[in-house]
Amino acid sequence: ILELNRYCKGLGIDLVPSLASFGHLYKLLCTKSYAHLCELEGSASAPFSFYDRQAHHTLDITNPESLSLAKHILSEYMQLFSSKYFNLCADETFDLGKGASRALAEEKGTTVIYTEFVTELANYITESGRTPMFWSDVISQEPEVYHLLPKNLICLHWDYASNVSSERLTRLANSGAEHLYVCPGVQGWNQLINKYHEAYENISRMARYGHECHAMGLLNTDWGDYGHINHPDFSRIGMIYGAAFSWNVDILPEEEINRQISVLEFGDASGKLVSVLDLLCHQD
């Protein structure tokens, strides 16, 4: 990490740390040392599956040890990066309010207790001299409580649907999310070849919505759900979409940008390679 951070810094790239600190803690909460901090009892003994790994393993926020542990791992990771930003993640805390924190969630509301824990983490990052970021999926379900979060917290609003609308983003912006990023995706998860048409639609729409609501920027994403079976090189086309659309409001038609990528990135004089790959990825 230190070497990569130095390399990026030399190229003017801000390498921003991103660390699960609330949900998606499969490896941590399956250990003998920390299994007792899992929201759902017995999760550590469940047979392995990619679904279980992704859908469960959220911290029990009613146990004071959970906050101490989260701060500890944030502190250790933070020291490896020179960036002034830190993404604490806190996405997909599916189990929150369903196990150890059920009574607390029934008393206050699941989203409210979520904001309380995220606030603790965000304030810790701020006190450490960094600007905190987090994913939007939980708070976007009940944006009316967004005011409970710290003002300097940057909201990373993700939505990967090809027909994504601006509704959730607008609700967040109108509910007090002053610092927003739009976060589309390159559509490579759970398949061998990325879905390029869907990536074009998703990224171009999110870029347009971000411009309309004066977002801070665009964060293009590539995920490895269920083992990341696709080769990373297949994501290059989606990455180029993100690079092109995030700075230029005059978005090129899909056929034209695919032609340009085919010629400039892959040396295909016919300009058809990306279109052929898109046809290939949609074959049964």
Language model segments and positions:
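Aromatic- and acidic-residue-enriched carbohydrate-binding clefts of CAZyme catalytic domains
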Residues: 1-14, 25-68, 92-116
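Short, small-residue-rich loop/turn micro-motifs
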Residues: 19, 41, 90-92, 184
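Short, ordered loop/turn segments at secondary-structure junctions
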Residues: 20-21, 223
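Substrate-binding groove of N-acetylhexosamine-processing glycoside hydrolases
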Residues: 3-6, 12, 64-79, 83-85, ...
